[in-house]
């Protein structure tokens, strides 16, 4: 069978390869210490589960509107107005099958052959592939630990051409945990507004997972002008431990949302109906479940960051958000694929190679795991690195 050129340009997920290898080792009875999780290790809060159960009992099991249940679209718009200072109405919201789906819909609606999409690296691994599937061109802008892996206004300006259509902003970041300060957000907004046809999509899936009093500012809240150029991608997976529920959303100007809704209507159609009622409960009830989770992540973050920075040859910034640390391994002399493969084979510790995120001199550790695993993993990591000297 001859497949399309479009598909041939898409790179298979490196993370799936590592995960598959770790699972195979476990099947063989080998105990693997995994730091690969891209999801919280907490169960979905009971009140969210109960809301979905009630929806099932009430017969909310049929097809729904492709754009989402009206009550959920209203709840999301209210949240964006009151918590993020983004003046959206329900009509500006599209409920999608997870945050990833919201971005995929967006790329299909906005990007076509010849369009460039600016993506700072390290990046979430699906961004460039989505752009390629939409037949656009990803323009990768490399950042370093010196700027906390954040793109500067000067770098953004230098990357913009007459073909630039979209800038992808992810704060807090996967894989680095970096969070742009309000001043940095305002500076990026000012650059975007220098160019008439440039838009920004702000991926805010980790917005609730913040540390040390860090403030999250949505770029669309800076002023009315940048609001008109902003698209918001978000979801319920990370903040509410709802990764398997597959409920995300896109917020933007009405023509865009209508176009994305049309695309969704001819692909997946509506998100699981009763899952949407769980999402409503997540928004409309007290947020203590999020606070409890973040408290646990805070404790784990301290242990893993201190532990890694005490190992000769390794270093990592202290993340301000999400639940990842991005570890610089350059001094070991190994690239990220070699480092990850050897660490897994010899010391049974699974991490994600930075090559998956556009940074081959780093690896990503997730601390969405228990404290015992973190401590054991750090001990094995130190033993492994000592063999490289």
Swiss-Prot record:
InterPro entries: Aminotransferase_I/II_large, AspAT/PAT-like, NHTrfase_class1_PyrdxlP-BS, PyrdxlP-dep_Trfase, PyrdxlP-dep_Trfase_major, PyrdxlP-dep_Trfase_small. L-aspartate binds at residues 38, 124, 174, 364. It is an enzyme of class 2 (transferase). It catalyses: L-aspartate + 2-oxoglutarate = oxaloacetate + L-glutamate. One of its GO terms (cellular component) is cytoplasm. Keywords: Aminotransferase, Cytoplasm, Pyridoxal phosphate, Transferase. Gene3D superfamilies: Aspartate Aminotransferase, domain 1, Type I PLP-dependent aspartate aminotransferase-like (Major domain). Its cofactor is pyridoxal 5'-phosphate. SUPFAM superfamilies: PLP-dependent transferases. Catalyzes the reversible conversion of aspartate and 2-oxoglutarate to glutamate and oxaloacetate. Has very weak prephenate aminotransferase activity. This is Aspartate aminotransferase. It comes from Synechocystis sp. (strain ATCC 27184 / PCC 6803 / Kazusa). The gene is aspC.
């Amino acid at each position: 069978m001859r497949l399309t050129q479009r598909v041939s340009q898409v790179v298979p997920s490196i993370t799936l390869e590592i995960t598959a290898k770790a699972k195979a080792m476990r099947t063989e009875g080998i105990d693997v210490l995994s730091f690969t999780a891209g999801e919280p290790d907490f169960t979905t809060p009971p009140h969210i589960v109960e809301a979905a159960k009630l929806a099932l009992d009430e017969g909310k099991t049929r097809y729904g509107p492709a754009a989402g249940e009206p009550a959920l679209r209203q709840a999301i718009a209210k949240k964006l107005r009151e918590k993020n200072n983004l003046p959206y109405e329900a009509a500006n919201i599209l409920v999608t099958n997870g945050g990833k789906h919201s971005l995929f819909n967006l790329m299909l609606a906005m990007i076509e052959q010849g369009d460039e999409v600016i993506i700072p690296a390290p990046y979430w691994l699906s961004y460039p592939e989505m752009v390629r599937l939409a037949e656009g061109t990803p323009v990768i802008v490399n950042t370093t630990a010196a700027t906390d892996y954040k793109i500067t206004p000067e770098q953004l300006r230098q990357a913009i051409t007459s073909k630039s259509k979209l800038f992808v902003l992810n704060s807090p970041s996967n894989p680095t945990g970096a969070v742009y300060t309000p001043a940095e957000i305002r500076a990026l907004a000012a650059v975007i507004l220098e160019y008439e046809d440039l838009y920004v999509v702000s991926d805010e899936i980790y917005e609730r997972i913040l540390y040390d009093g860090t403030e999250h500012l949505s770029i669309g809240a800076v002023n009315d002008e940048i609001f008109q150029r902003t698209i918001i991608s978000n979801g319920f997976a990370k903040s509410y431990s709802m990764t398997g529920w597959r409920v995300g959303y896109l917020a933007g100007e009405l023509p865009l949302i209508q176009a994305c809704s049309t695309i969704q209507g001819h692909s997946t159609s509506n998100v699981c109906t009763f899952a949407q009622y769980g999402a409503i409960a997540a928004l409309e009830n007290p947020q203590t479940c999020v606070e409890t989770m973040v408290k646990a992540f805070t404790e784990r973050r301290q242990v893993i960051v201190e532990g890694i920075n005490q190992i000769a040859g390794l270093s990592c910034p202290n993340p301000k958000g999400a639940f990842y640390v991005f570890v610089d391994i350059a001094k070991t002399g190994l690239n990220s694929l070699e480092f990850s493969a050897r660490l897994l084979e010899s010391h049974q510790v699974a991490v994600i190679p930075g090559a998956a995120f556009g940074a081959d001199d780093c690896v990503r550790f997730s601390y969405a795991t228990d404290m015992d695993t973190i401590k054991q993993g750090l001990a094995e990591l130190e033993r492994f690195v000592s063999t490289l000297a």
